[in-house]
Amino acid sequence: EALISNEKDNYLPKFSPDGSQIAPVEDRRTIKVRNIDSGDEVVLLDETQLFHMRDGDKYFSWSPDSKWLLVEFDQLLNNADVYLLDASAKQEPKALVNSGYYDRMPKWVQNGKQMIWMSNRNGLKSYATSGSTEYDVYSMFFTQEGWDEFNLSEEQYKLKKAIEEAQSEQETDEESSVEKEAKKILEKRNSKANNVVKGAAQVIQQRKDKEVEELQFDWDNLEDRVAK
């Protein structure tokens, strides 16, 4: 069964991580998002915002929570920017990187808490319309917490991890106490009831394992939280 069937040329489709949406490039100059179950579509970028030069010249990637897309946005021939698109199209596209140089191929890392991309802003380059150029890899931190952790010294980072491990062990001990009490209660019930409870617990745990944390963005001073 065709997921998209119309008179348009639809290519470079990318599924959202949760499998509920698909984002194709329509007629090479429009990026859409389509809900697979309902068939509803929204336009993220249209033909007035994109141009086409060759096959495969559109680059975008889904966020882990399936709510955002990073896109290489090149309206002009002499530079490319990185934009953040709301997959529901309720928010306007937001420029994350707008250096005036070529900023390309943005990718989500650290479960969506950061992105990395390539830029020739500080590399060797030809200022003619053609010629070779040198790219470096940069990273942007979407939260202040992530940026602060990145800038910790080695000793500070070790201390932070030690505190987190201690807190985790304490939580585990507390959970173990609860589990022991629960087991005592279950032992008083028949094996059939035990199996039902265990089965339900497994289903709940499986659902929790599949849950993806919704991404957070600290917009203030975002452009300053960049490392090469």
Residue ranges and their predicted role:
Residues 1-11, 20-38, 46-55, 67-83, ...:
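A flexible loop/linker signature enriched in serine peptidases of the S9 family
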Residues 2, 216-227:
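A short helix->beta-strand "capping" segment at the edge of beta-propeller domains
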Residues 17-18, 64-65, 110-111:
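Residue-level detector of Asp-centered blade-edge/turn motifs that repeat once per structural unit
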Residues 42, 93-94:
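A structural motif specific to WD40 beta-propellers
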Residues 58:
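Ligand-binding grooves and catalytic loops that recognize ribose/phosphate and carbohydrate rings
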Residues 76-77, 107-110, 132, 220-223:
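A structural signal for short secondary-structure junctions
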